[in-house]
């Protein structure tokens, strides 16, 4: 269960350190807003929307080591990696295909491809505990994944465009 943003113990996790201004976090906020089909979140700021991506150490300790991923955690995981894919597309100008496979135990893999090139491959473990200590850490992780994928595309441009 995620804690509300107004809880003073967890406001540290959504501190305004400029991380919300990164292209990755803006994209993630757009994707979260796209899931608001009833307009319930239209008055919320990006920090409030993205606060669910933070899991403090106290919350992480409360989650069992072994467990099945909850649907809301799977949605956040899907949105996070969808944002990675969209930002890679925006920066490279190439169509990116994302494959996300998760087992019932919370182990899986995410794979990003374009044409014949695998631009990013990541093994996922403990998916039921997915989250970041702060939004800054979320932005840093997402931006690093995008940079790694762009580096692969720049290293093998012929394969990426084949």
From Swiss-Prot:
GO biological process assignments: nitrogen fixation
InterPro entries named in the record: NifX-assoc_nitrogen_fix
One Pfam family linked to the record: DUF269
UniProt keyword Lipid biosynthesis, yes or no: no
Cysteine-cysteine disulfides: none
Alphabetically ordered keywords of this record: Nitrogen fixation, Plasmid
Family, per entry: Belongs to the UPF0460 family.
Record protein name field: UPF0460 protein y4xD
Taxonomy of the source species: Bacteria, Pseudomonadati, Pseudomonadota, Alphaproteobacteria, Hyphomicrobiales
């Amino acid at each position: 269960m995620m804690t509300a943003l107004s809880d003073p113990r967890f406001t540290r996790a959504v501190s305004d350190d400029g991380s919300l201004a990164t292209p990755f976090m803006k994209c993630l906020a757009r994707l979260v807003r796209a899931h608001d089909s009833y307009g319930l979140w239209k008055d919320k700021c990006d920090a409030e929307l993205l606060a669910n991506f933070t899991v403090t150490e106290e919350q992480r300790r409360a989650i069992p080591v072994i467990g099945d991923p909850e649907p809301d955690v799977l949605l956040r995981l899907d949105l996070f990696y969808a944002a990675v894919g969209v930002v890679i597309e925006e920066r490279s100008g190439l169509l990116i295909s994302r494959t996300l496979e998760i087992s019932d135990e919370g182990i899986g893999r995410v794979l990003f491809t374009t044409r014949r090139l695998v631009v990013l491959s990541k093994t996922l473990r403990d998916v039921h505990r997915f989250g970041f200590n702060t939004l800054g850490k979320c932005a840093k992780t997402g931006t690093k994944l995008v940079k790694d994928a762009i580096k692969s595309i720049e290293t093998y441009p012929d394969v990426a465009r084949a």
